[in-house]
């Protein structure tokens, strides 16, 4: 055998003495297939003498081992590396088919992805501006070339062309797409399996004999600090719902994220105890009570201001919308439910207002009862009641022109004091408890102190107007809901002057102090009455002195 594959070799030469020109041997040399089969079937005869050879290097041993032959080993190695190289070339060719150098395509001005879209977008430009003949010709040729290429390549599954015979190009393209999709799906299926293998819990590998050991292991090695989301602080996130817009398309609220500074801190919330909560609640209630008592003492002007500042909902009549409300058929069920909810809220507000007014009326009733009891108690223990004689009206005509005429008229009218006193006692027999001398009728100090207790309790002849006095009826005053509108109720409250009995007995407390009846301005009749009392006291004194024999200075009439 040749030592190297590159060396040329030929068939062995015929041995010496071989006669080719012999016709018999020539005929014998024409062997058939049958002779070839016989030759193969006959065993080889052992050669008696070997032909001479130049070198024994190329002679094969009797027991040939291919592994020991270096040439065979070289051939095996060469064929193995040739196969690897062939596989690598095929892989590179497949990658080269899938790979596109888009940068090179952009440099060359050939971009297959955007050619069709550019042509479609530029069709309007051809009509807008009159193109040149060369540009029109080049655009038409380009379009024709694209159509021809698409026909030759078979298009795709969406845009196919009629091709004679089987469209191998399209078939190959679809097969490649299916193969790539299957490969991607397999990769996606393999990824979770790898992740599950990596995420295998080491706890499963460890064997625990007791439950306590497992819990200790979990506490030491598996304790995780929980991460808190900053958006979920108390009061951080809120929902803003637009209630004013009744015709909104959607009822989706707006999410509002407040600043951290506006949110209450966790420490401030957790440090509150039950005592602090009770104290804060008590202070709140006391502040409400304090404000309520101040609001009761508002003047009429302030009341009018407050009523002007009231929202329009408070001015609505409770029966204002009854009979006017017509439900619309075009409204959605959600709008109807919203309307019903608002109606219920208004009814609740009205009930609360009524209950508040009733409670206020009950409080006034209780106050009147207490005042009545105080008045009765005062009447029982009053020692210095006003004499009923003073309540009698006196027929006093026009005042006299001078003091002389006044004295003359008094002397003519009341000739005897005893008779006058008798008539008075007949008129009022129930005035036995009256202390006459104490009030200055027959007191010797009357001349020095003419203004006595009667003057401090001056009463006019006019009848007292008790129509404004609160009689203490059980029904109570009129409330807000006894009027049709808020304007009528406010007008009634501004003009109302219902005073309790204590005001008639003790006077009305004004801003400058309590103004009682004893400080009331006296009219003309009261002034004349007081002057008459003074003069009658002087006359009585002189009569007594004359009776005792004392000389009295007489006036000159």
UniProtKB/Swiss-Prot annotation:
GO terms for cellular component: cytoplasm; mitotic spindle pole; nuclear chromosome; nucleoplasm; nucleus; U2-type precatalytic spliceosome. The modification Phosphoserine is found at residues 287, 417, 460, 536. Residues 342-375 are annotated as: 17 X 2 AA tandem repeats of R-[ED]. Residues 294-303 have a biased composition (Basic residues). Sequence repeats lie at residues 342-343, 344-345, 346-347, 348-349, 350-351, 352-353, 354-355, 356-357, 358-359, 360-361, 362-363, 364-365, 366-367, 368-369, 370-371, 372-373, 374-375. The modification N6-acetyllysine is found at residues 98, 137. There is a cross-link at residues 151, 310, 331, 386, 388, 404, 408, 496, 501, 509, 541, 543-544, 553 (Glycyl lysine isopeptide (Lys-Gly) (interchain with G-Cter in SUMO2)). It is found in: Nucleus; Nucleus, Nucleoplasm; Chromosome; Cytoplasm, Cytoskeleton, Spindle pole. GO terms for molecular function: identical protein binding. Its main location: nucleus. The modification Phosphothreonine is found at residue 485. One of its GO terms (biological process) is mRNA splicing, via spliceosome. Pfam families: RED_C, RED_N. Keywords: Acetylation, Chromosome, Cytoplasm, Cytoskeleton, Isopeptide bond, mRNA processing, mRNA splicing, Nucleus, Phosphoprotein, Repeat, Spliceosome, Ubl conjugation. Residues 1-90, 181-205, 294-402 are annotated as: Disordered. InterPro entries: Red-like, RED_C, RED_N. Residues 16-25, 304-313, 332-398 have a biased composition (Basic and acidic residues). Belongs to the RED family. Component of the spliceosome B complex. Interacts with SMU1. Interacts with MAD1L1. May interact with DHX15. This is Protein Red. It comes from Rattus norvegicus (Rat).
């Amino acid at each position: 055998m040749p030592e190297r594959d590159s060396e040329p070799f030929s068939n062995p030469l015929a041995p010496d003495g071989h006669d080719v020109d012999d016709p018999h041997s020539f005929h014998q040399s024409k062997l058939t297939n049958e002779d070839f089969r016989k030759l193969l079937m006959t065993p080889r005869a052992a050669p008696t003498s070997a032909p001479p050879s130049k070198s024994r290097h190329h002679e094969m041993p009797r027991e040939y081992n291919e592994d020991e032959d270096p040439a065979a080993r070289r051939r095996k190695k060469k064929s193995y590396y040739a196969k690897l190289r062939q596989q690598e070339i095929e892989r590179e060719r497949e990658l080269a088919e899938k790979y596109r150098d888009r940068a090179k395509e952009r440099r060359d001005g050939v971009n297959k992805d955007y050619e069709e879209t550019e042509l479609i977008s530029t069709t309007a430009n051809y009509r807008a501006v009159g193109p040149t003949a060369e540009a029109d010709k080049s655009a038409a040729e380009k379009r024709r070339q694209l159509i021809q290429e698409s026909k030759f390549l078979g298009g795709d599954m969406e845009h196919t062309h009629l091709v004679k015979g089987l469209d191998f190009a399209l078939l190959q393209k679809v097969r490649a797409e299916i193969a790539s999709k299957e490969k991607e799906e397999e990769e996606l299926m393999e990824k979770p399996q790898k992740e599950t293998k990596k995420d295998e819990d080491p706890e499963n590998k460890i064997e625990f004999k007791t439950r306590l050991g497992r819990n200790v292991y979990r506490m030491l090695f598996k304790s995780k600090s929980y991460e808190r989301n900053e958006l979920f602080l108390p009061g951080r996130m809120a929902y803003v719902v637009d209630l004013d817009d009744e015709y909104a398309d959607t009822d989706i609220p707006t999410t509002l994220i407040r600043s951290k500074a506006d949110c209450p801190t966790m420490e401030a919330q957790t440090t509150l105890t039950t005592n602090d909560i009770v104290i804060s609640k008590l202070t709140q209630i006391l502040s409400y009570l304090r404000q309520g008592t101040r609001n009761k003492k508002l003047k009429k002007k302030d009341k009018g201001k407050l009523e002007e500042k009231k929202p329009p909902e408070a001015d609505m009549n409770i029966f204002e919308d009854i009979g006017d409300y017509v439900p619309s058929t075009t409204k959605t069920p959600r709008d109807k439910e919203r309307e019903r909810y608002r109606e219920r809220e208004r009814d609740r507000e009205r009930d609360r207002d009524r209950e508040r007014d009733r409670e206020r009326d009950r409080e006034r009733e209780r106050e009147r009862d207490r005042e009545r009891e105080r008045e009765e108690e005062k009447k029982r223990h009053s020692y210095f009641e006003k004499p009923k004689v003073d309540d009698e009206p006196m027929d006093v005509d026009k005042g006299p022109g001078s003091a002389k005429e006044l004295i003359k008229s008094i002397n003519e009218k009341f000739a005897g004091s005893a008779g006058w006193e008798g008539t008075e006692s007949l008129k009022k027999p129930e005035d036995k408890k009256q202390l006459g001398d104490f009030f200055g009728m027959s007191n010797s100090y009357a001349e020095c102190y003419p203004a006595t207790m009667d003057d401090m309790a001056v009463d006019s002849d006019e009848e007292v107007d008790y129509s404004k006095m609160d009689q203490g009826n059980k029904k109570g005053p009129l409330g807000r809901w006894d009027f049709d509108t808020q304007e009528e109720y406010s007008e009634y409250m501004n003009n109302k002057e219902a005073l309790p009995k204590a005001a008639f007995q003790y006077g009305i407390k004004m801003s400058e102090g309590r103004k009682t009846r004893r400080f009331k301005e006296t009219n003309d009749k009261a002034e004349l009455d007081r002057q008459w009392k003074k003069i009658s006291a002087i006359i009585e004194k002189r009569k007594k002195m004359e009776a005792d024999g004392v000389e009295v200075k007489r006036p000159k009439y």
